[in-house]
Structure formats: structure tokens, C-alpha cells
Amino acid sequence: MKSFFLVVNILALTLPFLGAEVQNQEQPTCHKNDERFFDLKTVKYIPIYYVLNSSPRYEPIYYQHRLALLINNQHMPYQYYARPAAVRPHVQIPQWQVLPNIYPSTVVRHPCPHPSFIAIPPKKLQEITVIPKINTIATVEPTPIPTPEPTVNNAVIPDASSEFIIASTPETTTVPVTSPVVQKL
């Protein structure tokens, strides 16, 4: 890939000169005035960016378009650091030193106050009537459910003997339950 770009660069730089030599061979050798030996209309210079943009798959990734910024620009998110040039033997110097701001900034920065310092006037309350709160949600009280309790009759019936105690219990009847599914034969 690097060799391809090298060949394209060499061709782009030498093409005008090769065209000029071919054109000079066609013209007579005697020139009365000092003029250029090649015509710009016949030899078209193809700049390298045109070659790269005509075939975008060969465009290298490592050419990133970045804006040029000053070293000590106030809008940059980081500072540039430099190593100290002279090192004294007995003094401990930190490994990196921050470059001083040599060039003063041309843009005047206006301080933005913190939101806690901004005074907000309170809202004016006019003719507020107090509305009493009414509890619209009633408390739900559980309803007692009567349970049937078997009662024991302790009364003595004259016809029966005194040994038997009759207890009245509710009668239960059994009902056969049939399934609603119809069986197919």
C-alpha cells in the first residue's frame, strides 16, 4: 500500500516535467524570448488529492483532518507539557512541568455565576383562600361473616330415653358432578 502511494506521488510530481520535455522536442530549438517551454493547457497537472479522492478506497486512514490550534489556546481541554531542559543535581524537579501562559488571551471571558448566586424573586400570593381538607377515602371495615355452628339440643324428650342426646346437624346431600367435556368415540 505504501509503495502504491509512493508511485502515485512520484507520477503526480514528475508528470508536468515529462510533458514539458515531450513538448520541447516538437518545437524548434531557437527561442527569441524567454518564455516557458510548456503550455499549461496541454499538460494538465493532476494533484495528489484529486487522485486520492477519485478512488476513495485507497484513501489512507492516517490522514486526519484536524484544525490548527495555538499551543496555549484557552479553549483547548488540555494543556501541553514540556520536559525541563536543565536538571540540577541536588534539586528534585518533577518529571513534567506545565508551560506558562506566555500569550495572553485575546477573547475576554465573562464569568458565569453559579446558579445558587442567582436571585429569583418569590412568587406573589394573592387572595389565597384556605380550603379545608376532606377525607374522601373512607376506611373499609371488614364485614363479619356468620358461620353456622352446630347447636346441641339438651332438651329431654319424654318419648326417648334419657341416655340419648339429640344433636341437630345440618343435612348434607351429595350431587354427582358431570364434566362438560363430551367424549368422542
UniProtKB/Swiss-Prot annotation:
Stated family: Belongs to the kappa-casein family.
Protein name as catalogued: Kappa-casein
Keywords assigned: Glycoprotein, Milk protein, Phosphoprotein, Secreted, Signal
GO cellular component terms, semicolon-separated: extracellular space
Signal peptide: 1-20
List of glycosylated residues: 143, 161, 178
Residues annotated as site: Cleavage: 117-118
Localisation: Secreted
SS bond list: none
Role this protein plays: Kappa-casein stabilizes micelle formation, preventing casein precipitation in milk.
Sequence positions bearing Phosphoserine: 161, 179
Tissue expression remark: Mammary gland specific. Secreted in milk.
